Amino acid sequence: MLEKLVDSLWKICRKSKFQHMTPIADAVDTFCFEPLHTPSSPPFVRDAVDVKRWMMLVVIALMPTIFAAVWNSGLQALVYQSSNPRIMEAFLHISGFKSYFSFVSQEIGIGSVLFAGCKIFLPLLFISYAVGGTCEVLFAIIRKHKIAEGLLVTGMLYPLILPPTIPYWMAALGIAFGVVMGKELFGGTGMNILNPALTGRAFLFFTFPAKMSGDVWVGSNPSRIKESLATMSSLAEKSHFDGFSQSTCLQILNSTPPSVKRVHIDAIASNILNLEHVPTQDVLQTQFATWAESYPGLTVDQLSLEQLQNFVTTPITEGGLGLLPAHFDSACSLTEAVYGIGKFSTGNLFFGNILGSLGETSTVACLLGAGLLLLTGIASWRTMLSFGLSAFFFAWFFKIMSILTTGNAGAWAPAKFFIPAYRHLCIGGLAFGLVFMATDPVSSPAMKLAKWLYGAFIGFLTILIRLINPAYPEGVMLAILLGNVFAPLFDNIALKQYRQRRI
């Protein structure tokens, strides 16, 4: 039946009036059946696995991240727009799989979560394929060549790196820009020097920054989410410092001013977690001894919120820690991110119970996809490993240098440098970029040594942008695009090194 339909399509396209539509018939035929094209030059290998089937393996590898995108976006949307502080409190204090699924089944409903997630993700996926596919077909007809299969993966990657609240027309504009300017302008699939999906996202990021960062990570209606959060904070009688918000870990990291030091978040953490010892304990005890002369009987790890704020914001000369009062709420938020408190726990970051772009939240889903890509040899393990190790090393390097340059266990160094290195691998789009974006075989280097250099370069830039650059909260997108630009240089260096060894 399917073969007859394809044959009918070929008969229509072979007519002189419709010959320009031949690329469409060829695309449908090769998608459904084994290609019948005979190569014009050796090697002559008979194999049913053509590029389209190769691309399908990448699509299969993306399935865990797609499911995670649907599930997490649906759950977060229903919780954050509920206007019910009890549900929000229960959600934020989930610990373990049993309590997580118990909460979902009792408070939300599995069907409701999946339905809400599909309403968010599927329209973006449809727009990506419809608009991107139209661009591909138009260029194939104009150039009179076959429709390339690159969009099969690009069309799926693109919606996974978008925030759930992105307007549909912006999503369409972004994929059109990515396909046309990022790929077709260079000659089409296999000729592009930049990753098309990331090119489209970068275009949206710099053209419509307010829609690509900030409070854009929950549901499909940002205004409704803001009203719901305000209502829940009011009903729960939350203060300005502990009110409900939709800030991501990277937003907090980026927005925290340099005046927030390690000693400030250690003081806050010692009270929130009741820690008897923190890395800057000696500095805390020295300052607290002077400050507590007016408050006999108090201990540094047993302060009320008002007392803690007073201690942290009192001038250093008077025994306090010298933080500006306006920055106390930033210090509280960063403490949660650095110490993994509440919604920023390591489990939430790893399994994806956090806010972010649709497909970038779940590290474990990305790792499942990585397993298939590595098993089939589609992705380079050298690129993945060097990217991950480089990011980990430089996150640790900034922390160590902060300690060495300031002394006192880094007490007076900016607190953002002390987020654990392993947590950098689980926040933002690092895991997704490492597995699916940096390993793009077209825009990444071909030589083995070049892959090591390429991955290390991207990892370094990612951490540098996250910790040093105040303008952009996330560095993965820009780092990979810059890595794409320098990929030929890395190949050239590797080739020269190879020739020298041969000589």
Swiss-Prot record:
Transmembrane spans: 55-75, 120-142, 160-180, 186-206, 361-381, 384-404, 417-437, 452-472, 475-495
Q: How does the protein associate with the membrane?
A: Multi-pass membrane protein
Q: Which UniProt keywords apply?
A: Cell inner membrane, Cell membrane, Flavoprotein, FMN, Ion transport, Membrane, NAD, Phosphoprotein, Sodium, Sodium transport, Translocase, Transmembrane, Transmembrane helix, Transport, Ubiquinone
Top EC group = translocase
GO aspect biological process, one term: respiratory electron transport chain
Q: Which reaction does it catalyse?
A: a ubiquinone + n Na(+)(in) + NADH + H(+) = a ubiquinol + n Na(+)(out) + NAD(+)
Q: Which GO terms describe its molecular function?
A: FMN binding; oxidoreductase activity, acting on NAD(P)H, quinone or similar compound as acceptor
Top-level lineage group = Bacteria
- A Gene Ontology cellular-component term: plasma membrane
> Which sequence positions carry the modification called FMN phosphoryl threonine?
T248
Q: Does the keyword Nucleus apply?
A: no
Job of this protein = NQR complex catalyzes the reduction of ubiquinone-1 to ubiquinol by two successive reactions, coupled with the transport of Na(+) ions from the cytoplasm to the periplasm. NqrA to NqrE are probably involved in the second step, the conversion of ubisemiquinone to ubiquinol.
Instruction: Name the protein family.
Output: Belongs to the NqrB/RnfD family.
Provide the assembly information: Composed of six subunits; NqrA, NqrB, NqrC, NqrD, NqrE and NqrF.
Can you name this protein? Answer: Na(+)-translocating NADH-quinone reductase subunit B
